[in-house]
Amino acid sequence: MPSPEPMIIVSLRYADAPRMYDWLIEAFGFEKHAAYYSEDGKTLLHGELRMGSSFIMLGSSENNEFGKLVSRPAELGGTTASPYIATDDIDARCERARKAGAEICMEPRDQPYGSRDFICMDPEGHVWCFGTYRPAQPAT
């Protein structure tokens, strides 16, 4: 049997990952997939959230091998990457994110390549881009 196609999954680190796990569900509409906590419940060792057929992974910042390689936005004074979520209902998604406390960095707008996008920042500084453009399909 052939192996499944490779998947690209974004992995993010948070100072308060247990809180952000719930916040991402509230603000962006992710669904819980998996969460593994430390015995005291203060550290999210590994979390997975699903949206459609896509996933993100997140966890608490720790001083381990991976943690030494990956920084949080607050440690960098910004971020070097941002997840892009291809979806419909951009205006409604923007309002949902705003109500949950996201900082809206770019209000919904139509782009010259046929997408409608907005950009926001979560409470710990990760930048999220939402748009109707789907890279697997030609732009209109």
Locate predicted features:
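Vicinal oxygen chelate
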Residues: 1-11, 21-121, 131-140
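Short acidic-aromatic low-complexity motifs
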Residues: 14-18
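C-terminal catalytic core of tyrosine-transesterase DNA break-rejoin enzymes
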Residues: 124
